[in-house]
Design a protein with these regions (language model features):
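Conserved beta-strand-loop-alpha-helix hinge in the C-terminal portion
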Residues: 225-249, 472-476, 484-485
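Hydrophobic anchor residue at the start of the ABC signature
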Residues: 158, 186, 422
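Helix-to-loop junction immediately C-terminal to a conserved catalytic motif
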Residues: 61, 317
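Conserved ABC ATPase "signature" region
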Residues: 122-140, 386-404
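Catalytic Walker B motif of ABC-type/P-loop ATPase nucleotide-binding domains
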Residues: 169-173, 433-437
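Conserved ABC ATPase signature
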Residues: 144-148, 152, 408-412, 416
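ABC ATPase NBD Q-loop/coupling interface
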Residues: 73-86, 326-349
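ABC ATPase C-loop
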Residues: 162, 425-426
Length: 485
């Protein structure tokens, strides 16, 4: 969320016994945190999913709200003042890129923060151009922001922050939706900006290998948001290696365990794409696609940001009409011989045939609790309540959500939201599951557990399609691959 004025001195961060408890919750997201970050330092914050990393960044950005949104203890300061009083010094890239795209044109969105802080108009557009180039977003400034992919929106959000030369740059999984080349471009853009301005950088990221070479310090948070390790990157990782692995933190040189697949004997096709074109009436994205989605097989959809992975996923899910060619279901997968195109199926017909997990999990939440969210689909289908309740309990346990069953889905961490969105589609046992970035926001432990669950689902005969940038996911699970160029 861009909120920084031009300055060339890094900000100092201080936490003194700081804690935050979200409204209506019994547990603390962060508890008794003591932390001091010197001006100009670059700090990588690690911790298992749900350890309060995002809450800490939101607190530093002054975005946690007042007493009606939660309870605060201790002190959290930026340059000796409350973060809300220092917003002209702070720029944050949120975990969800959609939530900080404000205006309809790329250039206007980057310029928005500078306009609010009174930067002279003559200086704004050169800074817009520089920021867009620095993050590798080579698009016209007039480009409609609604046409951007998730990864492009992440770059746009970062450009808006860097254009304002903040003293404190806060990054919450800034590369989660980026391809491998984009990850390095964004990291290098951040380090170049910090080199030029002296800004303090605090980055939260599950995958450590990208950021370890460019940070001065690693801070590891435990389950309650307390510091359990703090120091220079290499010695801290080496000294705490076993503890970090047991806590579910990704450690360089420790790949996830191999998963043994037990593929079903029959792999008949469920969907066939014939010269398929996907996109929107005014914005075609991809044409000439020919492939089959088969029962019990995992198909990975890969490619650089902006190549149409999410658009293809929505089309396969029956949520976006093809722009050309055909997407046909095979009997008996189709509701009837005359209704073979998923775009024409009713919502209840989709629930048991094709279920889709969106790139942004919040786009599919409709209820006020985690458990109710999982039960929503079965209720619509009027499934047996006893069997459904048992299945919901099983999924809550498998996806480490049992202790959050009564939480509002919107108060979960990014990784928890992703696992909940997966649970909501598995509960109805569809024949085909379409997932957009299924491993987003996962620590090592929850990643392994989620991938193992999807492997079991595929082995049971369910077809799985995953649009992903996660090479390890592809290597472990994919039987087939659709590479979009």
């Amino acid at each position: 969320m861009p909120s920084a004025a031009s300055t060339h001195v890094g900000a100092r961060v201080t936490a003194q016994q700081w804690g935050w408890q979200h409204a209506g919750q019994n547990s603390w997201a962060v508890s008794e945190l003591d932390l001091d970050i010197e001006a100009g330092q670059r700090v990588l914050v690690l911790g298992p999913s749900g350890s309060g990393k995002s809450t800490l960044l939101l607190g530093l950005a002054g975005l946690l709200g007042g007493a009606d949104e939660g309870h605060e203890t201790g002190r959290l300061l930026v340059d000796g003042s409350r973060p809300a009083d220092r917003r002209g010094r702070i720029g944050m890239v949120l975990q969800d890129p959609d939530s900080q795209v404000i205006l309809s044109r790329v250039g206007d969105d980057v310029a928005f923060g500078m306009e609010n802080f009174g930067v002279p108009r003559a200086a704004i557009w050169p800074r817009v151009d520089t920021a867009l180039r620095s993050v590798g977003l080579n698009l016209p400034v007039s480009q409609d922001t609604s046409t951007l992919s998730g990864g492009q929106k992440q770059r746009l959000a970062l450009a808006g922050v860097l254009a304002m030369n903040p003293g404190l740059i806060l990054l919450d999984e800034p590369t989660a939706n980026l391809d491998s080349e984009g990850v390095l471009e964004v990291r290098d853009a951040v380090t170049a900006a910090a080199d030029a301005s002296g800004a303090t950088v605090v980055v939260v990221e599950h995958r450590t290998q990208t950021w370890l070479p460019v940070v001065d310090r690693v801070v590891v948070l435990g389950p309650n948001g307390q510091v359990v390790a703090d120091g220079a990157p290499e010695p801290t990782i080496a000294r705490q290696r076993e503890h970090l692995l047991q806590s579910g933190i990704w450690v360089p040189g420790a790949p996830p365990p191999r998963i043994s697949r037990r593929r079903p004997a029959a792999d008949e096709p469920l969907l066939s794409a014939i010269d398929l074109s996907v996109g929107y009436p005014t914005a075609p994205v991809r044409a000439g696609l020919d492939f089959q989605i088969r029962r019990g097989r995992v198909t990975a959809v890969t490619g650089r940001n902006g190549t149409g992975k999410s658009t293809l996923a929505l089309t396969l899910g029956g949520l976006l009409p093809p722009q050309g060619g055909r997407l046909c279901a095979q009997a008996p997968f189709a509701p009837s011989p005359r209704r073979v195109e998923p775009i024409g199926w009713r919502s209840k017909e989709l629930l048991t045939r094709i279920a889709t997990v969106f790139q942004d999990p919040e786009h599919q939440f409709l209820t006020g609790s985690v458990r109710d969210e999982i039960l929503l689909g079965p209720k619509a289908l009027r499934h047996n309540s006893t069997e459904t309740a048992a299945r919901a309990d099983e999924l809550l346990d498998r996806l480490r959500l049992s202790h959050l069953a009564h939480r509002n889905p919107y108060t979960l961490s990014g990784g928890e939201k992703r696992r909940l969105s997966v649970a909501t589609v598995l509960i109805t046992r569809p024949a085909l599951i379409v997932l957009d970035e299924p491993t987003f926001g996962q620590d090592r432990r929850t990643w392994v557990e989620l991938v193992a669950l999807l492997s079991e689902i595929a082995d049971s005969g369910t077809a799985v399609v995953a649009a992903t940038h996660d090479d390890e996911f592809v290597d472990l699970l994919a039987d087939d691959r659709i590479e979009l160029q």
